[in-house]
Amino acid sequence: RVEDVVTPGHLERALAESWGGSRGHALVFLPGAGEIRRAAETLEGFARANGARVLPLHGRLPLEQQQAALAPSSDRKVLLATNVAETSLTIDGVDLVIDSGLARVLEHDPRTGIDRLQTVRISQHSAEQRAGRAGRLGAGHVVRLWSQREHASLAAAELPELDRYARTGV
């Protein structure tokens, strides 16, 4: 399963290796709320030991929690986000992005006639968008949790949602 490729342990190791070279907030891209919850549990000890807070950021959170994640803070933050943070938000102070390379997309299964959220690899375009979140207002750094060979094999861009449905006959 594609979602088993990146574990909370991978994230913790990547964060630990990159944290010292960063002064701002870290933005970690994960595919969904479940992965965010598991990563938050794993990273809480690291964050506490480094004077930071772990904050989730996804569309199913109550507005107050989303606002807390986005609010300016003198404390360093580890923001665990879905692709909602890829293009629609500017988060001040982020200078480190850790990218799982995964996203959840709605896909139609023509065999069953059911729409399901699937965890998929992102495109090269999405990877660049995510990398651009680091250092929007200064120098930044991105850690991709996949190899250059895997990056070269990614689609150039996502198929638009309407096209995904059109290809399945919906």
Name each model feature, range by range.
Residues R1-V170:
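P-loop NTPase motor module signature
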